[in-house]
Amino acid sequence: TLSLHDALPILQTRDFEGIAFVNLVDFDMLYGHRRDVAGYAAAATEFDRFLADFLPGMREGDLLMITADHGCDPSYTKTTDHTREYVPYLVCGKGVKAGMDLGTKLCFGTIAKTICEYLEVDASTLDGKSVWQEIRA
């Protein structure tokens, strides 16, 4: 298994068609469920620095989506279970409008349909509504 630092630079230097999925599991396993606020903050800061280096290398046609499968507030100490925050859905690339606010209406079906429309894959059997036409530049 490659780390984030190993995997994403490879994606920027190799041509391929399709989708690459990277799971940043440490945010959840090492910091969120362990209620390690300082570790979570350090990991978020490291990820921010990584993005600052990664984003300028995105090519025409590249699309980056960042989201989460659930909340996991490291400062909530009553339980180590998932917490109930809204999760982010950040989309960027040269073909995406900047500064769009899609609100809180999104679900995984929306994300799946958006990916399918972007990749020109039939998604007629999936739930959700694509937001690709709203966000494309």
Language-model features: where?
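Feature captures the catalytic ectodomains and active-site-proximal regions of enzymes
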Residues: 1-137
